[in-house]
Design a protein with these regions (language model features):
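P-loop NTPase catalytic cores that bind/hydrolyze ATP
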Residues: 1-9, 77-86, 115-116, 255-271
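Metal-dependent DNA phosphodiester-chemistry modules and their immediately adjacent helices/loops
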Residues: 27-45, 185-276, 281-283
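Active-site proximal loops enriched in glycine and acidic residues that flank catalytic Cys/His/Asp
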Residues: 3-4, 36-39, 83-85, 122-123, ...
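An active-site-proximal beta-strand-loop segment
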Residues: 116-134
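Flexible loop/turn segments at secondary-structure boundaries
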Residues: 7-13, 41-43, 90-93, 125-129, ...
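Nucleic-acid-processing active sites and adjacent nucleic-acid-binding tracks
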Residues: 102-110, 128-178
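ATPase catalytic-site recognition across NTP-hydrolyzing enzymes
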Residues: 35-120
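ASCE P-loop NTPase helicase motor core
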Residues: 1-60, 155, 164, 182-191, ...
């Protein structure tokens, strides 16, 4: 058996298990030869090409490798896997199980006094859709999350703005280059009172990490929505950047993961809320 490590969209379960068995010494009658980088690296570095490609200089050329490499940040992981033999260390199967998600169901959420609403908007990368979610702090300090809707982008932004007019709306976090600038402009023109955040990549990474941390830490609550459960119980991690950050993909072919992304953004806004500063008037 030979080949490259599994990619983020091809789990390669048999290959992964065989490697683990041999490297751990549990398989006595098999050997393993590997040319790979231990960490995510600069795939455009020719020195690393020679360290990880034994056929380079004979049947493989530098020109061939150079032509295969991508230019964007998102291609970095795949380039490392395909050309530097990088093995992704996190579990590329389901990131959140159905049982883990159902453990957080609540039937009658009680809102905190003077509660604030935090909205997350995600423009899908794989489909022409946009999803909206909301998060709010409960009376017991848990964070309640809810998926509001996922609609085609062509339906325009009026339906989103309708929710943002809520008098308790505090912040809306909008992610997705496909429409965040237009939505920001529409919100401002509609004179909605809520703060608008267009998160940086580092903040999206933080939002996803915090969502899972609080989910597994029993801080998140939800109302058992079938569409949201389907998205969350069929998700997998996708690497973002070079620092171990992750986002989400769906393990179901043709499925939209933006509902989960929107929920994670809304939760992030709520979890980081410090409360309104009281105005002090001195005479």
């Amino acid at each position: 058996m030979c080949g490259t490590p599994p990619t983020a969209v091809s789990a390669g379960t048999v290959f992964v298990k065989l490697r683990q068995l041999i490297l751990s010494g549990e398989s006595e009658d098999a050997g393993w030869a590997e040319w790979s980088v231990p960490n995510l690296s600069d795939a455009h570095n020719p020195d690393l090409w020679y360290e990880t490609n034994p056929s380079l200089g004979s049947i493989l050329t530098e020109r061939k490798i150079r032509s295969e490499l991508g230019k964007s940040e998102e291609s970095q992981l795949d380039d490392n896997i395909q050309r530097l033999g990088y093995w992704v260390s996190y579990n590329q199967k389901s990131a959140i199980s159905r049982n883990e998600w159902r453990d957080c169901i609540i039937s009658s959420p009680k809102l905190s006094e003077n509660h604030a609403l935090f909205f997350g908007v995600k423009y899908s990368k794989s489909m022409p859709n946009v999803s909206l979610a909301v998060a709010v702090r409960l009376a017991d300090e848990k964070i309640f999350v809810e998926a509001i809707d996922c609609q085609p982008i062509r339906n325009n932004n009026a339906w989103i703005i309708g929710f943002l007019r809520n008098c308790h709306a505090d912040t809306v976090i909008i992610d997705g280059a496909g429409g965040q600038t237009i939505l920001k402009s529409d919100i401002e023109q509609a004179e909605c009172k809520c703060e608008i955040i267009l998160p940086k990549v580092s903040e999206v990474i933080e939002a996803n990490s915090l969502f899972e941390s609080n989910l597994f830490g029993n801080i998140i609550r939800h109302a058992d929505q079938p569409a949201l459960e389907q998205a969350i119980s069929n998700c997998e991690h996708r690497a973002i950047g070079s620092g171990g950050g992750f986002g989400y993909n769906s393990v179901l072919e043709g499925a939209d993961i933006s509902l989960l992304d929107a929920v994670a953004l809304a939760h992030w806004g709520c979890a980081n809320y410090k409360g309104k500063k009281k105005q002090i008037i001195q005479y």
